[in-house]
């Protein structure tokens, strides 16, 4: 996975694993910001519990996976990431691809959740148009005595499961576009099956 994509994935969970500062437009409990805050509370509670009881890490990791699955729209993310190649895939192939991508993203997220990074987040605004929403934030990432400011936008849509994130844009770099560019290049130069094999090998790599 490219450095740019790893960086985008890293910051894509920043706002739900940190203390949030600043002010944003008032949000309803069922709105996108409300969803973010509820997820933040749950994630932080689980992380505090895990820190107090390392022996119970596996059950907590399973719960973290469940919470993330309720927050990230994996089917939509997979469809957008595969782009024009999605239509050529059968229902079984789509399900297999979506599951591989889900496992990779969840593993990456859980790795970052355990990394003890220090973030400060400010909400800059919320824009809702019908069933689509965009939340803009500014994040200061602190690690090993260094700070880096990033502008993060979260693309969300409202479906049967409520508001869910389907893309994260970091300093104008989209996670979905990064995936789509990489996947399309592999498919064009090799094949769709070659892409699946690369994803499977990535899952076998140590987390």
Regions found by a protein language model. Give the residues of each.
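N-terminal export leaders
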Residues: 5-10
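Bacterial N-terminal signal peptides
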Residues: 11-19
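Early exported N-terminus immediately downstream of N-terminal targeting peptides
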Residues: 29-109
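A mature extracytoplasmic/lumenal domain signature
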Residues: 101, 125-127, 139-141, 154-156, ...
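Surface-exposed, charged secondary-structure patches
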Residues: 107-148, 199-207
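Short beta-strand edge/turn micro-motifs at domain boundaries
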Residues: 149-177
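Low-complexity, intrinsically disordered terminal/linker segments enriched in charged
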Residues: 167-207
């Amino acid at each position: 996975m490219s450095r740019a994509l790893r960086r985008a994935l890293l910051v894509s969970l920043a706002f739900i694993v940190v203390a949030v500062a600043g002010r944003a437009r008032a949000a309803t409990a069922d709105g996108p910001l409300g969803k973010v805050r509820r997820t933040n509370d749950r994630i932080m509670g689980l992380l505090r519990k895990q820190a107090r009881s390392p022996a119970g890490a596996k059950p907590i990791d399973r719960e973290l996976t469940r919470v993330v699955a309720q927050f990230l729209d994996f089917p939509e993310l997979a469809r957008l990431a595969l782009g024009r190649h999605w239509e050529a895939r059968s229902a079984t192939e789509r399900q297999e691809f979506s599951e591989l991508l889900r496992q990779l993203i969840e593993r990456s997220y859980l790795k970052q959740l355990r990394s003890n990074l220090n973030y400060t987040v400010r909400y800059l605004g919320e824009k809702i148009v019908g069933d689509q929403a965009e939340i803009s934030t500014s994040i200061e990432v602190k690690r090993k005595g260094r700070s880096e400011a990033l502008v993060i936008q979260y693309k969300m849509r409202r479906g049967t499961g409520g508001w869910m994130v389907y893309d994260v844009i970091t300093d104008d770099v989209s996670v979905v576009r990064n995936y789509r560019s990489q996947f399309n290049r592999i498919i064009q130069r090799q094949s769709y099956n070659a892409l699946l094999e690369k994803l499977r090998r990535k899952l076998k790599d140590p987390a």
